[in-house]
Structure formats: C-alpha cells, structure tokens
Amino acid sequence: MDYSYLNSYDSCVAAMEASAYGDFGACSQPGGFQYSPLRPAFPAAGPPCPALGSSNCALGALRDHQPAPYSAVPYKFFPEPSGLHEKRKQRRIRTTFTSAQLKELERVFAETHYPDIYTREELALKIDLTEARVQVWFQNRRAKFRKQERAASAKGAAGAAGAKKGEARCSSEDDDSKESTCSPTPDSTASLPPPPAPGLASPRLSPSPLPVALGSGPGPGPGPQPLKGALWAGVAGGGGGGPGAGAAELLKAWQPAESGPGPFSGVLSSFHRKPGPALKTNLF
C-alpha cells in the first residue's frame, strides 16, 4: 500500500500550527508579547493546501520571519583576553627620586605648599621630571606634613597633661608636709627631755608658801613646820637618787641670804644650823 498521503498531511498540519502563533521576531522585547489562545481564522482568499503533495506548501515563507540567532546580544558581550592584558599594563610604575631632585622639591615646598602650574612645570624641567610626577609628589608631601603636625600636637597635649598631674601631686605633698609640721609626731615627743624628778622639783617650788606661813602669826611656833616637812621630804627623796650633786644643789638653793635685823630674823636663822646626825645619814 502507498502511505505517501499521510506524510503530506503531517507536513501541512505542521505548517498551519507554526503560522497560527504569529511572528516573534517583530517584537523588540520578548516579555511584552501576550499569548492569545484563540487562533485567527484562515484567510479566505488564500489557496488551500492540496491534499496530496507537500511541495505546494509555503514553508519557505516561515524561514524569512524567524529572527537571527543572538540578535539581542550587544557587541563584544564576551570579554576578550586582550582586555585583561591591557588592564594589567595600566599599573603605575613607582618613581624613584634622586637626592638632587628631592633637594629641589623640598626647597620649593619650604617656600609654598601649593605651587601653581607654572612653578610645577618649571621645576619639572629643571629636575628632569614630568609635571604630573611633581604634582603627585607635592600631594604626598602635604599629607606627610599634616601627619607630622598631628603627631606633634598629640605629643604636646600629652606633655601638658603630665605637667598638670605633676603640679597637682606636688601641691598635695606640700599640704601633707604642712599638716605634719603642725601636728607633733610620736618621734618628736620621744626626743623631748624627760621631766625632772619629783624630789628635786618640789624644793624649788616649796619656798613660795614661806611668807604666808610666816605672816599668819607673830609666834615662831607652828609657822615653819610645813617648810621643814617639805625640806626633809626633798632631802630624803634626793638621798635616794644621787647623794653627791643632788644634795649639794638642794642645800645651796635653800641657803638664804644673810638676815638682818627684822621680825623674821629668828626664824630664818634656824636654817643656818648645821644638820643633825639624821640628816647626815640621809645625805651621805
């Protein structure tokens, strides 16, 4: 059997299916195309496809409406290896300055930190450099100068803060020294001389009640009794210590001047009597 008519029918159906969706190449943006599920009607004026023979179907017209591949891709979308090589070549070479060039640059920088274009060009011709190199050097030199100024100001502020702390410490030490001089310390009280012995100090203070005791009454009876008691107590106390110098000093202090004629001559003359045996034994 001959099945050639089946092949011709399949080719015609494929052609009708492709023409039903319209032309996609005419749209500038593929996302803006809206799909319509309704198929448009076939043109009535066009000749229908014959049932047999696939040579009469206009399949060549469909190829004219198809877009060319990669039509939306821009020019040189994919980078070439030569572009990366050019970027690597654009790296700046570090400039090395000689001592003579640095000397001239520093001299101009001492005069002005911002030289104009004419000064830079003249300096570049003088030291055999380009004007761009001279300009970059001045930019770096100004940055270095500002950094040095900031470091110097920070160091000065730290020194001033240290000086203020030292002054505050000295003032506190001065206040402490003033307080220590005003209030006695335990060591200063220890260096004071010891108080005199009670036996030696009492005879020096005991002659003060003499006029009171003597002026209380004209009679020589009970007046000098307290004096004698104090005298014997002082002699006895002094005998317990050093009997040599202490007793001699005590007797010398109690020896009165020569008494003249008066109401108390009898009383005072009693002190000139020689000490008895009891006193001698206590003193020596």
From Swiss-Prot:
Biased composition (Low complexity): 153-163, 199-215
Stretches that traverse the bilayer: none
GO CC terms, sorted: chromatin; nucleus
One Pfam family hit: Homeodomain
Chain segments carrying region Disordered: 145-284
DNA-binding segment(s): 90-149
Localization terms from the record: Nucleus
Keyword list, A-Z: Activator, Disease variant, DNA-binding, Homeobox, Nucleus, Transcription, Transcription regulation
Chief site of localization: nucleus
UniProt GO molecular function: DNA-binding transcription activator activity, RNA polymerase II-specific; DNA-binding transcription factor activity; DNA-binding transcription factor activity, RNA polymerase II-specific; RNA polymerase II transcription regulatory region sequence-specific DNA binding; sequence-specific double-stranded DNA binding
Coiled-coil blocks: none
Family to which the UniProt record says this protein belongs: Belongs to the paired homeobox family.
Disease field: Fibrosis of extraocular muscles, congenital, 2: A congenital ocular motility disorder marked by restrictive ophthalmoplegia affecting extraocular muscles innervated by the oculomotor and/or trochlear nerves. It is clinically characterized by anchoring of the eyes in downward gaze, ptosis, and backward tilt of the head. Congenital fibrosis of extraocular muscles type 2 may result from the defective development of the oculomotor (nIII), trochlear (nIV) and abducens (nVI) cranial nerve nuclei.
Function: May be involved in regulating the specificity of expression of the catecholamine biosynthetic genes. Acts as a transcription activator/factor. Could maintain the noradrenergic phenotype.
Protein name: Paired mesoderm homeobox protein 2A
Organism (species): Homo sapiens (Human)
Native organism taxonomy: Eukaryota, Metazoa, Chordata, Craniata, Vertebrata
Name of the gene: PHOX2A
